[in-house]
Amino acid sequence: RFQIASLVVYYSFLQRKERIFLFLVGRLADIGKSAIFACMKLEISDWNMIPYAGAWSRQTEWFDALVRAKQAGEDYVNHIVLCEHPHVYTLGRSGKERNMLLGEEQLRRIGATLYHIDRGGDITYHGPGQLVCYPILNLEDFSLGLKEYVHLLEEAVIRVCASFGIVAGRLEKATGVWLEGDTPRARKICAIGVRSSHFVTMHGLALNVNTDLRYFSYINPCGFIDKGVTSLQKELGHEVPMEEVKERLCKELVNLLS
């Protein structure tokens, strides 16, 4: 048990087919002269390498279940999912087809697929060596609005980058995490795109760890034609242990949600 200001975080490790962390987060909220102790569950699951369609279907099930339980006043669990995907491109609701630079036959040749999905944002790439994180959260549990939530995701990644000695930050009017964002050398290391309904979220962030960046050359990443992409591996000059990045990201997300 760890005491963090007015927050108590209980941590336990469960060994299953998937690696799962279970956090019970207790928050003290002052109402008048009384204090109410609210307890909520936050489960962190590692799906490892999983095809995009399967992950999308599964997180949609969890998202729908959380929305239903919230509306019915029933118990529910907040989730943070970690995974990697085989080569895939996803186009968000506001995305433009012209930002996909390959046709169907060319996509098959490079072993990739394209999905039109229900998150915000334009087109992005997911593939081996990229850490994808899908938080499925009731934002009201954490006193967050949608803009604050996106800012929190960015902040978690900025802190992870800093832990590796990389200075990262934000770029005005461009969601995600960037290096040298206000210079001609601006390059994106993490894309963010979310969906929210009834203050429940799905989709999330994609952090380039040991990603094959050549796959970004087949798109205009997030709709940009004048900015680059990078990875932890490219910036550091060596491969980065994925498990280490997962642990650091989980730590930062839990600390910020707390």
Language-model features: where?
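Short hydrophobic targeting helices and cationic amphipathic motifs
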Residues: 3, 7, 14, 22-24
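N-terminal lobe of the biotin/lipoate ligase/transferase fold
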Residues: 39-186, 239-240
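Short conserved catalytic/interaction loops centered on acidic-Pro-aromatic/His motifs
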Residues: 166-171, 202-203, 215-219
